[in-house]
Structures are given as C-alpha cells and as structure tokens.
Swiss-Prot record:
Transmembrane region(s): 76-96, 132-152
InterPro entries assigned: ArsR-like_HTH, HTH_ArsR_DNA-bd_dom, HTH_MetalResp_TranReg, WH-like_DNA-bd_sf, WH_DNA-bd_sf
SMART domains: HTH_ARSR
Compartments, as annotated in UniProt: Cell membrane
Record membrane topology: Multi-pass membrane protein
Keywords, alphabetical: Cell membrane, DNA-binding, Membrane, Transcription, Transcription regulation, Transmembrane, Transmembrane helix
Gene Ontology, cellular component aspect: plasma membrane
Name the UniProt record assigns to this protein: Uncharacterized HTH-type transcriptional regulator MJ1553
Length: 157
C-alpha cells in the first residue's frame, strides 16, 4: 500500500499504462532524475505492478495486469484509506472528549467533597458504559474489516 502515497509512482503507472518506457524516457517526461525514477520503478517491480523487458542494451518497463487493476481501482483505494484515517480521527476525538468529561467529573466530585455536600453524584462518564461507545465500536470494527477486505480483494485481482 506504500505506493498510494507517492505521486511519482502513480504518474509512472499512468504513463506505463499508455505504453512501455525506459528509465530515461520516463525521467524526461516526468521531469525527475533517472535515479529517482529507477528507485520508484524498482519498488513498483517488487510489488509486482511493473515488469522489465530487456532489448539488447535497453530495458523497457511495462505495467502488469496487477498494476492495471490497481490503477483502475486507485480512486476506490484512496477512498478506503481516507475512510480509515477518518475513523482514526473520530476515535481520537471521541477519546479526548471522554478524557475531558472524566477530568470534569473529578473536579466536580472534589468540589462536592470540599463543600461538605453529601449527595451522591451519578454523572459517571466512563466511556465503556456508554451505549454510544459500544455502537461506535461495533460500526468502526465492521467498517475497518470491510475496508481491509475490499483493499485485499482489489490488490489480489
């Protein structure tokens, strides 16, 4: 999945989807150094997304069927990865919100004790007891499993 976060690798895949290229040709077209293009091509080759064809002194790179499938489904993959990051962001927000509520509860209970008011404070915000937490946990778990499954299916095609 590392290739998704590299604009150069995506550009290389798009170019190789048009026709086969050498490192020099890709370097000129994309405006990158030959060593940079070579690094990206080697990474794509290791992932099985491109293949090499040797013709005497020239080495041409071509996109594989797996590379074509990934390129075709690139938008879906980006959407899935974005969804995972959105879920992570929501979880972080939710956890910090709970920490804030628990800190407030501690301050309130301390104030009640200091003032000598002997009423029972029932405002527990422990997030394990909240139905919202359980619903959020279940939905997030299913979404993450579904997203991982879809990514796996797309890459394995």
């Amino acid at each position: 999945m590392k290739f998704l976060f590299s604009k150069t690798k995506i550009e290389i895949l798009k170019k190789l989807n048009e026709r086969n290229y050498t490192i020099s040709e890709l370097s000129k077209i994309l405006g990158k150094s030959k060593s940079t293009i070579s690094e990206h091509l080697n990474a794509l080759y290791e992932m099985g997304l491109v293949d090499k064809e040797n013709y005497s002194k020239w080495v041409y790179y071509k996109i594989t069927n797996k590379g074509k499938k990934v390129l075709e489904n690139l938008e879906a993959l980006i959407l899935m990865v974005s969804s995972i990051f959105a879920l992570i962001g929501l979880w972080i927000y939710y956890i910090f919100k709970q920490i804030k509520y628990q800190a407030r509860e501690v301050v309130l209970s301390k104030t009640v004790v200091e003032r000598g008011i002997y009423t029972t404070y029932k405002g527990s915000t422990t997030f394990q007891k909240e139905p919202l937490f359980l619903i959020f946990l279940i939905i997030s778990t299913f979404l993450i499993i579904f997203i991982v499954y879809l990514v796996y299916k797309i890459i394995r095609r």
